[in-house]
């Protein structure tokens, strides 16, 4: 498993800057704010949807059909990811009270339309769900010839928009961060993977293996040796890595030294050989 850490600190700075800017607008009328209201109502939790379309294979693609009664699968959740710092790449993760799921979308700067804390309602019927390298997600079916298997890749942003509605305004205070004290809590059974994949987590009392020595990544690199940095928990477990894109705005920052807490999206990678 791996965590993707990047967006928390950038978002805080953006909020502060917006507050300062707004304070300079005293001489102007405040424009009316149009608050979006979704028409569809959720009838399925994220956990229920993930279980209904789960397959144990590392890669697969399946269409989301209607329910036995003919109704659509409709979920809702709040956005927990952000690509503002160019570390999260072409995907959006949302959570509800039961779980989290990722949408693979072929677009940059998704944070401009889907802010952290924004609730979105998704009509999942007619979409495609599956796995790419072990991570369950929504996307577009593609055939992986080397592995002789189907998987899901990036869906078009237009297709994504046709299936979603914004509901209300972003509220980061309503996001739920799950606190973890040991990597051993990350169960890799099917049930455990459905629970943990794509979740927003805080891992307490961890340190980087190369803290104070290496940087988060290397410029524009995609090599695993460059972008993956080993994290060690309080029990000495080292089966979680922090993955930082070579395009991230903080790629050249030194890994912090000493123990601390880290917040990020918990992802998962599994090769066709079964290693992870």
Positions of PLM-derived features:
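Alpha-helical transmembrane segments
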Residues: 14-18
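C-terminal motif of bacterial Sec signal peptides marking the signal peptidase cleavage site
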Residues: 19-23
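OB-fold nucleic-acid-binding modules
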Residues: 25-89, 93-119, 123-276
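Bacterial N-terminal signal peptides that target proteins for export
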Residues: 1-11
């Amino acid at each position: 498993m791996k965590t993707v850490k990047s967006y928390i600190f950038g978002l805080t700075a953006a909020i502060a800057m917006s507050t300062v800017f707004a304070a300079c607008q005293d001489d102007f009328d405040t424009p009316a704010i149009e608050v979006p209201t979704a028409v569809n109502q959720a009838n399925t939790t994220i956990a229920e949807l993930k279980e209904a379309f789960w397959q144990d294979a590392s890669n697969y693609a399946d269409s989301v059909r209607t329910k036995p009664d003919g109704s659509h699968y409709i979920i809702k959740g709040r956005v927990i990811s952000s690509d503002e710092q160019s570390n999260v790449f072409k995907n959006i993760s949302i959570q509800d009270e039961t779980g989290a799921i990722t949408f693979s979308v072929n677009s940059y700067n998704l944070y401009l339309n889907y802010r952290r804390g924004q609730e979105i309602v998704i009509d999942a019927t007619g979409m495609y769900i599956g796995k790419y390298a072990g991570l369950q997600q929504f996307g577009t079916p593609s055939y992986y010839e080397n592995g002789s298997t189907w998987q899901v890749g990036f869906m078009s942003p237009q297709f994504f928009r046709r299936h979603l509605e914004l509901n209300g305004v972003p509220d980061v205070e309503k996001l739920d961060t799950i606190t973890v004290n040991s990597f051993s809590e990350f169960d890799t059974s099917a049930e455990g993977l459905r629970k943990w994949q794509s979740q927003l987590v805080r891992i307490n009392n961890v340190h980087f293996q190369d803290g104070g020595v290496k940087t988060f990544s290397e410029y524009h690199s995609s090599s695993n040796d460059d972008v993956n940095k080993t994290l060690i928990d309080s029990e000495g477990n080292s089966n979680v890595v922090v993955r930082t894109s070579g395009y991230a705005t903080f790629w050249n920052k030194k890994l912090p030294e000493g123990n601390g807490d880290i917040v990020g999206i918990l992802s998962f990678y599994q090769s066709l050989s079964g290693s992870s």
